[in-house]
């Protein structure tokens, strides 16, 4: 008799996706981040659901409702900090997942990669709206600054901003609409994840060598389920250490003060995971130019399949490209640091140099070095 998992209409889908899925035999721990991101999304949806039961999306009570969750709800402090730090962990896994895709040439799976970039935008939008909900000082001013960027769009900009605000400033209407959007977006993200996996399973996984591995496949279960469990345990260890010992390590102290439109914080900055893009935005003196650079800093990921000119898919055997990749990684760390610094000398200059370097490496240096490596292959 055939196993039920292979015949049942629903179990069959699960079987083909997670059990009998043919996977390359040589994929490393860098391939764990897909499952870890799934875990992060699950944690965020569950903790968010419990927070939504106690949260009120009204400017007069939002801040005190978060305080009430932390003080009066059973394990409310734990749920709140799991949700806040879960977002941080989500982005750490996301950046590592994207980095792995860039290093090993996974972007040549065009549809999977583009859905992934759309997912990145969706997660960033969700995180931004979630940051506004506690209605602290940085929530209010962050929302004001970031939404105000849309006013740089010619002709319709100002109208668009007021339409998003629901008035002439960030106020009750803004908070009321951000709350349902923040609630529904994770479910849209979950649906997009399904599409992401659908396209991935059409082609099969990439592997560190970048070579076709059709002749050397092993079943996903038990080999990679066990490997993923190790990743999950390490992630949960890091996560719970963060939540239970230093829950405010990655947060902003300003957000413990209720939102006050009459008092501007000395340095408005978003959460750490947006700082690299924020630094690129600030490094251009023109408002529209800054907004375009901000959007393009993420959208540029979609150009990688077009900019790939190397005869080898992975960077595993391309030392020159490897050097550039790690310079790019260091540049992103620099941009993240600069985004958190005040707008003054020498940070302005460092930010501008790092921003130019970011675009130069991706648009010119990597393709040029790839061409050089192609030439060196013939020698």
UniProtKB/Swiss-Prot annotation:
Signal peptide: none annotated. GO terms for biological process: mitochondrial electron transport, ubiquinol to cytochrome c. GO terms for cellular component: mitochondrial inner membrane; respiratory chain complex III. The chain crosses the membrane at residues 33-53, 77-98, 113-133, 178-198, 226-246, 288-308, 320-340, 347-367. InterPro entries: Cyt_b/b6_C (IPR005798), Cyt_b/b6_C_sf (IPR036150), Cyt_b/b6_N (IPR005797), Cytb/b6-like_sf (IPR027387), Cytochrome_b (IPR030689), Cytochrome_b_C_euk/bac (IPR048260), Cytochrome_b_N_euk/bac (IPR048259), Di-haem_cyt_TM (IPR016174). It is found in: Mitochondrion inner membrane. Belongs to the cytochrome b family. Component of the ubiquinol-cytochrome c reductase complex (complex III or cytochrome b-c1 complex) that is part of the mitochondrial respiratory chain. The b-c1 complex mediates electron transfer from ubiquinol to cytochrome c. Contributes to the generation of a proton gradient across the mitochondrial membrane that is then used for ATP synthesis. The cytochrome bc1 complex contains 11 subunits: 3 respiratory subunits (MT-CYB, CYC1 and UQCRFS1), 2 core proteins (UQCRC1 and UQCRC2) and 6 low-molecular weight proteins (UQCRH/QCR6, UQCRB/QCR7, UQCRQ/QCR8, UQCR10/QCR9, UQCR11/QCR10 and a cleavage product of UQCRFS1). This cytochrome bc1 complex then forms a dimer. This is Cytochrome b. It comes from Sciurus aestuans (Guianan squirrel).
């Amino acid at each position: 008799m055939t196993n039920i998992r292979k015949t049942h209409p629903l179990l069959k889908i699960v079987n083909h996706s997670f059990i009998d899925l043919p996977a390359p035999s040589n994929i490393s721990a860098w391939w764990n981040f897909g499952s870890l991101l799934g875990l992060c999304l699950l944690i965020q949806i569950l903790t968010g659901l419990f927070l939504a039961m106690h949260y009120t999306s009204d400017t007069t009570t939002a801040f005190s409702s978060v305080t009430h969750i932390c003080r009066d709800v059973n394990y409310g402090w734990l749920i709140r900090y799991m949700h806040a730090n879960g977002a941080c962990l989500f982005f750490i896994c996301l950046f590592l997942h994207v980095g792995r895709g860039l290093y090993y040439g996974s972007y040549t799976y065009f549809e999977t990669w583009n859905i992934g970039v759309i997912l990145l935008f969706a997660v960033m939008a969700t995180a931004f709206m979630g940051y506004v909900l506690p209605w602290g000082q940085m929530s209010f001013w962050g929302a004001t600054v970031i939404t105000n960027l849309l006013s740089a769009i010619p002709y319709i900009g100002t109208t668009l901003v007021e339409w998003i605000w629901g008035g002439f400033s960030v106020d009750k209407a803004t908070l009321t609409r951000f709350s349902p959007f923040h609630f529904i977006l994770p479910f849209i993200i979950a649906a997009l994840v399904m599409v992401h996996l659908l396209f991935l399973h059409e082609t099969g996984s990439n592997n560190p060598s970048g070579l076709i591995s059709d002749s050397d496949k092993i079943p996903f279960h038990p080999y990679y389920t066990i490997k993923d469990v190790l990743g999950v345990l390490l992630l949960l260890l890091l996560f719970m250490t963060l939540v239970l010992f230093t829950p405010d390590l990655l947060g902003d102290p300003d957000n413990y003060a209720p939102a006050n439109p009459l008092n501007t914080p000395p340095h408005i900055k978003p959460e750490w995971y947006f700082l690299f893009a924020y630094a690129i935005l600030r490094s251009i003196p023109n408002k529209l130019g800054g907004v375009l650079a901000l959007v393009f800093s993420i959208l540029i990921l979609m150009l990688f399949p077009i900019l790939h000119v190397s005869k080898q898919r992975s960077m595993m055997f391309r030392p020159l490209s490897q050097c550039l990749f790690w310079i790019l990684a260091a540049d992103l760390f620099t941009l993240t640091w600069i985004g958190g610094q005040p707008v003054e000398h020498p940070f302005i200059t460092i930010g501008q140099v790092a921003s130019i370097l970011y675009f130069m490496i991706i648009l010119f240096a990597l393709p040029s070095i790839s061409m050089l490596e192609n030439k060196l292959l013939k020698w």
